[in-house]
């Protein structure tokens, strides 16, 4: 994953200073900052520097190459020097026939170190390998029960990465399913009994659901009923998904409006803080 030209330049200040200013403006104490690997590759230098500069405000989530034999030692060394929030795994390109990035012998060493360091591992899927990757992830979660496994964009079909050149995919390429199943197929439902599996609901989900005329609050309520409200967390995707933070936060509150007060707090704050910040 050597990086690529972005779909569009971020329309918010994505520097560490800009992020902290945004946090101050919205009275946010801490955030997880996730490496934007499809642009910057596996070089996590800036996000690590930002977290060192603002250790009480920014928690780094690193994107690593699990096929690289040096990754486990790299993670141990970095964890000795500063607090890490977690890691994220993604295929470097859309290849439906290879899961080396997730389940190879080398990748198992990275999973082992994640369990050793108590780091959550987030995973994101391309459309073409989604089914095989979810099946593999279920096996891996069982092998490493001490690792919180976080599926980005819930793992539903409309939350996958568009396969093809790194260009903006039109929303018409995604066809979310409404009631009664809301895109939760048997693959995702089958993860409900794996207690170290968690599901990140993001602005990408909300944008695509809204484009299809599907109420986001009904979607999140259904996720809570099927997967468990304590397994859900919100991710703003600010800096990746275009648009300012405020409307994204408003959309998240709207999506959480059918949750109970306790479920809402867990979804919008507590579950993510517990997994990534030990809060």
Q: Where do the protein language model's features map onto the residues?
A:
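Active-site gating/metal-coordination segments in enzymes
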Residues: 38-135, 139, 200-203
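Active-site neighborhood of phospho(di)ester-bond hydrolases with catalytic His/Asp-centered motifs
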Residues: 32-35, 61-62, 88, 150-152, ...
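Acidic/histidine-rich helix-loop elements
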Residues: 1-13, 96-99
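Catalytic pocket-lining loop regions of alpha/beta-barrel enzymes
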Residues: 100-233
